[in-house]
């Protein structure tokens, strides 16, 4: 059984996305559980200078690093590896078999993750070159974790 934790920059989810996330989190209970920890977003105005944007990313990075415990960590990153669902399930299983039962996943803010956070993870995962709303990425990640667990346990969910 693995316990999964998602650290995600941004607070609050719209009702529909929250309902979807909560559905997958509920399904994950039988596989060890899925927890969401929200990280406050760095201050942005929409017209900030590169220095202000860098400070916001650094502030978010500090808050993320404070929440990272001893579990194995993955980060969603545009430059990360593209995996299909079966390969993600197999990778998670390899980590579990190697003793890394608890896995954490990090979703950055609108400007990505600070380099210190990226240096502290074991794996960088990409959902592709497109940009997605961060609240929807939470749902997509929860669904992929659930799909991975059903693949590992032979549950007929993945087709």
UniProtKB/Swiss-Prot annotation:
It catalyses: pseudouridine(1915) in 23S rRNA + S-adenosyl-L-methionine = N(3)-methylpseudouridine(1915) in 23S rRNA + S-adenosyl-L-homocysteine + H(+). S-adenosyl-L-methionine binds at residues 108, 127-132. Its main location: cytoplasm. It comes from the Bacteria. It is found in: Cytoplasm. Keywords: Cytoplasm, Methyltransferase, rRNA processing, S-adenosyl-L-methionine, Transferase. The keyword Metal-binding does not apply. Pfam families: SPOUT_MTase. Its EC number is 2.1.1.177. GO terms for cellular component: cytoplasm. GO terms for molecular function: rRNA (pseudouridine-N3-)-methyltransferase activity. The keyword Nucleotide-binding does not apply. InterPro entries: Alpha/beta_knot_MTases (IPR029028), RlmH-like (IPR003742), tRNA_m1G_MTases_N (IPR029026). Specifically methylates the pseudouridine at position 1915 (m3Psi1915) in 23S rRNA. Belongs to the RNA methyltransferase RlmH family. PANTHER family: METHYLTRANSFERASE, RIBOSOMAL RNA LARGE SUBUNIT METHYLTRANSFERASE H. Homodimer. This is Ribosomal RNA large subunit methyltransferase H.
């Amino acid at each position: 059984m693995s316990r999964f934790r998602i650290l995600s920059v941004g607070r609050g989810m719209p009702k529909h996305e929250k309902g979807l996330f909560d559905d997958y989190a509920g399904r994950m209970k039988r596989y060890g559980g899925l927890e969401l920890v929200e990280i406050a977003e760095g201050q942005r105005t929409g017209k900030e200078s590169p220095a202000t944007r860098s400070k916001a990313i650094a502030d978010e990075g500090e808050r993320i690093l404070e929440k990272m415990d001893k579990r194995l960590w993955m980060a969603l990153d545009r430059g990360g590896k593209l995996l299909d669902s079966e390969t993600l399930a197999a990778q998670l299983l390899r980590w579990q078999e190697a003793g890394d039962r608890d896995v954490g996943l990090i979703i950055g803010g609108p400007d990505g993750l600070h380099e210190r956070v990226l240096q502290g993870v074991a794996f960088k995962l990409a959902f592709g070159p497109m940009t997605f709303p961060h609240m929807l990425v939470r749902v997509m990640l929860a669904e992929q974790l659930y799909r991975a667990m059903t693949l590992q346990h032979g549950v007929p969910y993945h087709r």
